[in-house]
């Protein structure tokens, strides 16, 4: 047996994964709940504990099935800060704006394990659709000296990748 070191990806104990989604039709809106698991690498946790805020974005795209045409694209932005004087973690949700504090980072990540979306602005006819979702650490908001190393370090690869679920609407909204 021949083994070649370095050719297989290293096992990681961190990353973002999309577990499942739930959809509910309400009066004039499609409610989508994304269930995900977020685990930060040691480098990301160390940066956070040393005053670097982390920005996480969850994106949702509603598409017409088969055509690949995007009908609606929405995202939710989150910012995590460590507050050293109080030893608390602060989670800021950009839209709708809210700020919460938590005693441990695991509590912040548990809060982010469920992300809610409401797609209400555009009427949809009954039919076949797809919901595409991804979550990632948004590196565009990182301090400039950290951006280049983040592009090449495996410790900063926090991206679930796109995941697609089918959606069938029996009645329009």
Which residues are covered by each model-predicted region?
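A short, structured loop/turn motif at beta-sheet edges
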Residues: 23-30, 65, 83-87, 121-131
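Bacterial N-terminal signal peptides
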Residues: 1-6
């Amino acid at each position: 047996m021949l083994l070649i070191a370095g050719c297989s990806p290293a096992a990681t104990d961190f990353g973002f994964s999309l577990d499942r989604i739930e959809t509910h039709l309400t009066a004039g809106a499609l409610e989508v709940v994304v269930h995900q698991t977020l685990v930060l690498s040691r480098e990301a946790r160390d940066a956070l504990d040393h005053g670097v805020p982390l920005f996480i974005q969850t994106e949702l795209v509603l598409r017409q099935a088969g055509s690949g045409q995007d009908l609606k694209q929405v995202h939710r932005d989150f910012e995590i800060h460590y507050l050293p004087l109080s030893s608390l973690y602060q989670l800021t949700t950009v839209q709708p704006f809210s700020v919460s504090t938590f005693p441990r980072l695991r509590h912040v990540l548990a809060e982010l394990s469920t992300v809610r979306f409401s797609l209400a602005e555009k009427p949809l006819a009954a039919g076949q659709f797809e919901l595409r979702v991804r979550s990632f650490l948004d590196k565009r908001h990182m301090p400039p000296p950290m951006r280049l190393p983040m592009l090449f370090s495996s410790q900063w690869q926090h991206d679930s990748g796109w995941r697609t679920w089918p959606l069938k609407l029996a009645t329009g909204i």
